[in-house]
């Protein structure tokens, strides 16, 4: 049996390569983990916009999940873009049948350019079917508000939102502060709530548009570390360092919200 850690991403494809499945697999590779994938949607997008979304038929999603379960030893996996309530319920049903290890749920709802990636009707399905299965959830501020109704602006409101999510079954909540209305602040703060501890992670806030795929990359790095057997707290801290390096060393690709730099963290080591 191989000693190489294996991880899975269940998400949408980004033709521009900056987010989704493409960002996840790049991150897995950079963190020394063999990556597998289940594609839930094919998007036509670049750094400027999302032009088309084609959701994958449920039977094809089920077949992909079975193919991975039958042949790979997955020790951690992440879920990104699912798009519809039907896909959410399809994936949740499969997760009750197959064991893929620790689940990191990135509740993808809106693309960096503003295009919706999750139907509003699917938010209830996300809360009902996937939150109880999640070991870690990584919402940004708009996603945290959509899931809980709480507008996170400080430590107190972050704790309120986290308590709601944990009451629904999530073990660890990471609320990402990059979308803060106080974006003039020089610091970007994330709030972390585990079953036994709570703490914040801070990094410089960079004035850059090269942030496409940051959420995908952050959760993918966390998933890769968990696949290697790292503790949840250490996986979160490594993911924070990884994405900070990726944002602070932009590639300047494209004419809009450009992708992050997946080589940056390794190059600084």
Kindly give the residue locations of the regions a language model identified.
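N-terminal basic/disordered segments at the start of proteins
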Residues: 17-33
């Amino acid at each position: 049996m191989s000693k190489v850690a294996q991880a899975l991403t269940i998400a949408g494809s980004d033709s521009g390569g900056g987010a989704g499945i493409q960002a996840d697999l790049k991150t897995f590779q950079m963190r020394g983990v063999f990556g597998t994938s289940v594609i839930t949607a094919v998007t036509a997008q670049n750094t400027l916009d999302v032009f088309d979304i084609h959701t994958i038929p449920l039977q094809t999603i089920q077949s992909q999940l079975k193919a991975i379960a039958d042949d790979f030893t997955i020790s951690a996996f992440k879920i990104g873009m699912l798009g519809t309530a039907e896909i959410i319920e399809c994936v949740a049903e499969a997760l009750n049948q197959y064991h893929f290890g620790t689940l990191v749920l990135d509740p993808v709802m809106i693309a960096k350019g503003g295009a919706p990636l999750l139907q509003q009707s699917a938010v209830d399905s996300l809360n009902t079917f996937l939150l109880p299965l999640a070991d870690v959830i990584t919402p940004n501020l708009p996603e945290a508000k959509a899931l809980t109704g709480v507008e996170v602006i400080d430590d107190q409101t972050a704790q309120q939102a986290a308590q709601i999510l944990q009451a629904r079954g999530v073990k660890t909540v990471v609320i990402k502060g990059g979308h803060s209305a106080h974006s003039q602040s020089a610091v970007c703060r994330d709030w972390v709530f585990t079953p036994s501890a709570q703490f914040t992670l801070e990094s410089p806030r960079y004035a850059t548009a090269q942030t496409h795929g940051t959420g995908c990359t952050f959760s993918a790095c966390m998933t890769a570390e968990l696949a290697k057997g790292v503790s949840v707290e250490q996986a979160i801290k490594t993911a924070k360092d990884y994405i900070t390096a990726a944002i602070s060393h932009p590639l300047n690709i494209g004419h809009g919200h450009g992708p992050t730099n997946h080589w940056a963290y390794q190059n600084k080591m």
